[in-house]
């Protein structure tokens, strides 16, 4: 992991390079990078993949109902748009409930703008995200 990027190595064999955005979501970038350093995401699947919308991962149980043992994060909503390749934090109905789950947008999803914390943008390897199995 470089200081301004992180690389997800997918079990399907592809690498996804994400440019981090600490300028818009410093707390969330710190959370993601600390979990990466701990190996939290190693072997974690994308448990929710909706074609034309997004792929969601970050739950160690693979069910979509769990996160890390760390406290939830305060929202860092911004004007950054949800476009193809945007990396954003998943959450429950509470704005301040993001923890470890995140999603990558397949296409523009402007209806999420200012409601979910954007923390990165895929720089390369989006074709591997596109190839994730639906589920």
Which residues are covered by each model-predicted region?
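Cyclophilin-like peptidyl-prolyl cis-trans isomerases
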Residues: 1-135
């Amino acid at each position: 992991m470089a200081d301004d990027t992180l690389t997800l190595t997918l079990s399907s064999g592809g690498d996804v390079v994400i440019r981090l955005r600490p300028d818009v979501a410093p707390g969330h970038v710190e959370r993601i990078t600390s979990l990466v350093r701990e190996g939290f995401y190693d072997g974690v699947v994308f448990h929710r993949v909706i074609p034309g919308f997004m792929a969601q991962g970050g739950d160690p149980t693979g069910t979509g109902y769990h996160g890390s043992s760390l406290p939830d994060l305060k929202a860092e909503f911004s004007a950054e748009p949800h476009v193809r390749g945007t990396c954003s934090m998943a959450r429950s109905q509470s704005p301040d409930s993001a923890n470890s789950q995140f999603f990558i947008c397949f296409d523009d999803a402007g209806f999420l703008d200012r409601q979910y914390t954007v923390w990165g943008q895929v720089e390369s390897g989006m074709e591997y995200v596109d190839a994730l199995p639906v589920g």
